[in-house]
Each structure stands twice: as structure tokens, then as C-alpha cells.
């Protein structure tokens, strides 16, 4: 049976944690930042976790993570 390919875009976006979850970066922090408040940008800065509902999709994209 052939190996399962990793989705390369997902491999660049998600990192697996020791407890089995996945870290991710928040959206809306790339451009057009002048109209966004400092508070909003500050809250988007730390890494988020992939929610339980999306976890299966991420695991399917990263079979060897």
C-alpha cells in the first residue's frame, strides 16, 4: 500500500502539541492593520488551538504528525 501524502499547506500552518492538539496562528494579522485596534491585534497575536470540530480534518491532512 502506498504512503499517504501530507497536505503541505496544512503542514506549514499547524504544529502538533505533546497532548495531541494542534497549534495554529490567528487570521486577520497580515495587512490592513491600521484600522484595527491595538487591543484587537494584541489578542490575535498568541497562538490558538484547533477546535474539537476541526481536529479530524487537520489529522486527516497530517497523517504523520
From Swiss-Prot:
NCBIfam families: rpmI_bact. GO terms for molecular function: structural constituent of ribosome. The gene is rpmI. This is Large ribosomal subunit protein bL35. Keywords: Ribonucleoprotein, Ribosomal protein. The keyword Ribonucleoprotein applies. InterPro entries: Ribosomal_bL35 (IPR001706), Ribosomal_bL35-like (IPR021137), Ribosomal_bL35_CS (IPR018265), Ribosomal_bL35_sf (IPR037229). It comes from Erwinia tasmaniensis (strain DSM 17950 / CFBP 7177 / CIP 109463 / NCPPB 4357 / Et1/99). GO terms for cellular component: cytosolic large ribosomal subunit.
